[in-house]
Amino acid sequence: MARITVEDCLEKIPNRFQLVLAATYRARMLNQGHAPRIESRNKPGVTALREIAAGKVGLEMLKKVPG
């Protein structure tokens, strides 16, 4: 599987700071047991970045507060 790069994710979320926040929130959700939106056997942080790069997750993560 191809390596994920920040540049791939920045195409979807241009602001690096928002990218980090969105990936962090999504990784927390995955860690709490939410289903991944892509097939992945990686850790939650990598899976979150892959979802962002694939366009499955975006800035809407910033509107959700992980519980």
UniProtKB/Swiss-Prot annotation:
GO CC terms of this entry: DNA-directed RNA polymerase complex
Keyword terms of this UniProt record: DNA-directed RNA polymerase, Nucleotidyltransferase, Transcription, Transferase
What EC number is given for this enzyme? 2.7.7.6
Write down the top EC class of this protein.
transferase
Tell me which Gene Ontology terms the entry assigns under biological process: DNA-templated transcription
One GO MF term, please?
Answer: DNA-directed RNA polymerase activity
SUPFAM superfamilies recorded for this chain? RPB6/omega subunit-like (SSF63562)
Q: Which reaction(s) does the protein catalyse, per the Swiss-Prot or TrEMBL entry? A: RNA(n) + a ribonucleoside 5'-triphosphate = RNA(n+1) + diphosphate
Q: Which Pfam families match?
A: RNA_pol_Rpb6
User: Gene3D superfamilies recorded for this chain?
Assistant: 3.90.940.10
Report which superkingdom the organism of origin falls in. Answer: Bacteria
Q: Subunit arrangement? A: The RNAP catalytic core consists of 2 alpha, 1 beta, 1 beta' and 1 omega subunit. When a sigma factor is associated with the core the holoenzyme is formed, which can initiate transcription.
Q: Which NCBIfam families match?
A: rpoZ
Chain's role: Promotes RNA polymerase assembly. Latches the N- and C-terminal regions of the beta' subunit thereby facilitating its interaction with the beta and alpha subunits.
Which family is it part of?
Belongs to the RNA polymerase subunit omega family.
The record's section on PANTHER family has: DNA-DIRECTED RNA POLYMERASE SUBUNIT OMEGA
Record-given protein name: DNA-directed RNA polymerase subunit omega
